[in-house]
């Protein structure tokens, strides 16, 4: 299947089962289905107005997705996944561009992504998309109420 037959659309709560199956298929290990990624949590996130989930479909099958969020000053690209059977065809690049546009449409002029150190492929992809690694003594820290959040 060619990239031309792939369509990007905004996902809704109706797409929850397909989305979580894609996350699992793609090996996204940070998914918390009992917490921050539960159906109820996703409903709250989508209703907040600061999160957009975009999906890439081929013939009705969800083969890629990305979450675009913002805090009103900076946009974030999260959870970029492509089904392993459809990788290396430009789909992730298209999803990044679509997420960037969604964030710009909401007024974001800074767009960032956090990339795990054991994912050099993702880092290379974002570099290719024009992102610059910001390595000036910044550390990511978080405080979580539970492992599922």
Segments predicted by a language model, with ranges:
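A short, internal acetyl-CoA/4′-phosphopantetheine-binding micro-motif in the GNAT/acyltransferase core
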Residues: 80-87, 115-116
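Acetyl-CoA-dependent GNAT
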Residues: 10-78, 96, 102, 133-137, ...
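Conserved beta-strand-loop-alpha-helix junction that forms the acyl-donor binding cleft
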Residues: 113-123
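Generic C-terminal helix-cap and adjacent flexible tail
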Residues: 3-5, 143-149
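Conserved GNAT acetyl-CoA-binding A-motif
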Residues: 103-115
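Conserved active-site tyrosine of GNAT-family acetyltransferases
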Residues: 126-127, 131
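Conserved acetyl-CoA pyrophosphate-binding loop and the N-cap/start of the following alpha-helix
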Residues: 86, 90-98
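Acyl-donor (CoA/ACP) binding surface of acyl/acetyltransferases
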Residues: 89, 118, 149
């Amino acid at each position: 299947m060619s990239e031309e037959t792939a369509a990007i659309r905004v996902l809704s709560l109706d797409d929850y089962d397909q989305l979580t199956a894609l996350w699992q298929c793609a090996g996204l290990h940070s998914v918390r289905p009992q917490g921050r990624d539960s159906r109820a949590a996703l409903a709250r996130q989508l209703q907040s107005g600061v999160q957009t989930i975009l999906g890439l479909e081929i013939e009705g099958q969800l083969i890629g997705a990305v979450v675009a969020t913002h805090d009103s000053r900076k946009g974030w690209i999260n959870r970029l996944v492509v089904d392993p059977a459809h990788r290396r065809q430009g789909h992730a690049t298209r999803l990044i561009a679509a997420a960037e546009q969604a964030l710009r449409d909401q007024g974001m002029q800074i767009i960032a992504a956090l990339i795990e150190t054991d994912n050099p492929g993702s880092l290379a992809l974002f570099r290719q998309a024009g992102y610059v690694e910001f390595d000036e003594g910044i550390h990511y820290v978080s405080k979580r109420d539970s492992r599922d959040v």
